[in-house]
Amino acid sequence: MKKIEIIEIPIFKLNKNSNKIEIKSTVSSMDHAKELKNINEKLYNDRNFMLELAEEQGYFLKYAKTEFCCDKELVIKALTKKDFNNERGVYKFWDSICETLRNDKDVILKAVSSYSMRNIENYFPTELFFDKKFISKCVKVGPHCLEFVWSEFKLDETIVYNAVKSNGYTLEYADPSLLNNHKVIMAAISDSGFGYEYAPLKYKKDKTLALKIMKKNKSTSPYEYLDISLKKDFEIAKLAMSVNGFNMFYAPSEVKNNKELATIAIKSNPSAYEYLDKKLQKDKEIKKIYNLVNKYSD
């Protein structure tokens, strides 16, 4: 298996003589963004340079001039990156943005789209938190917001549809009454199968639907969440194992005992061998295939 090379970003002790490359590299680290205060005044006041920094990450705004924290173009650029997580989230520097922009719809939508600003009740002005039209837009670009919207909106078909269409997993946060809504369920699961685990049983027993979804997006598979009757189905199991042999982990004994399916699964992902029936693991042909595939995957 090819090793992933980890590239360390160089960090500098910034001062008035630091160049742009050193500043960008250092400020891109949240732990060292405060070094921005030490750079020369010309660059510290240079809006164009601040726009360049905003392309890296937005946390530097905590240490930038107040006027830049009120600059809509700059702030939106700082919010554009989607690599924020719970540790590097928008909320880490949201309070540094001026109040006017924190109440601006364009800015809020951009923040929500970063996927880290989920608990919107803590950040949205009251009038926008209860604004159905605006919330509908928010869940389109930041579907995980559905978890924190007003409970009445979790009952709203349009809002929930927009969220699950963007990310099927957010079906988890919909009001249970909407789990009987065919339009909503299909919006969640039809593209990639995400959200299948929250769908009613009849969808998990629908072979035609399962095959259609599995063939449409071969990088993912809802096999884990299908009804046992479909997991046993040879056609379904064959397709699931060809997508990712790890699906053998979720397979019933009838599939774990099947030599043809085992072969397909191992060729797709050698880890499938671990989940085969013990007798099949001892099969000479299966062991040969596993050893061969495993050799070239290392």
Where in this protein do the model-derived segments appear?
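Non-catalytic tandem-repeat scaffold regions and their flanking low-complexity/translocation tails
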Residues: 4-298
